[in-house]
Design a protein with these regions (language model features):
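Catalytic machinery of carbohydrate-active enzymes
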Residues: 1-156
């Protein structure tokens, strides 16, 4: 089965959610053959669908089960995650139960953990920090995100 989903898991606040929008748009540009899907709160997902033209699925539709392990995940969750080529996750860590469950369901998928909490030593905007995090693991996506963020800063 060809993996065509790019999943963006986000359960944070609205401001952090909006900061993630250049990531979604960059994925659409860099991987136009893939489906970019936000897994987030229902209304935030609908907003992203309307403004960005991406897909969304409500995080409350069984995705919390990933915190209990892969075996307990409902079929809809397993199917979506198994079809992922790349998974961006805000608020999870490489060594937590959620990540282990995702890796068990989709071992070939590229799992990338992101945070909107900049280290004290980082003096830039959180959007630029997101670019720095992505650069090490997905340079093409990072370059596209960086171009969009730079354009936003130039235009205001």
């Amino acid at each position: 089965m060809t993996k065509r989903n790019v999943l963006i898991f986000h359960s944070g606040a609205m401001g952090d959610f909006v900061v993630s929008w250049p990531l979604a748009m960059a994925c659409c540009r860099v991987m136009p053959q893939n489906r970019v899907i936000y897994v987030t709160a229902g209304q935030k997902g609908k907003l992203a669908e309307h403004v960005l033209g991406v897909e969304s699925i409500d995080i409350e539709s069984g995705f919390a089960s990933l915190w209990q392990g892969a075996d307990g995940a409902p079929e809809n969750v397993r199917k979506l995650v198994a079809g992922a080529a790349m998974i961006f996750s805000f608020g999870t860590h490489d060594d937590d139960q959620w990540s282990a469950a995702v890796r068990a369901i989709a071992p070939e998928a590229r799992l990338i953990h992101l945070t909107t909490k900049c280290p004290d030593a980082f003096a830039g905007h959180v959007a630029r920090y997101m670019v720095e995090q992505i650069k090490a693991v997905q340079p093409a996506v990072a370059a596209a995100v960086g171009q969009m963020v730079s354009a936003l800063f130039r235009r205001g």
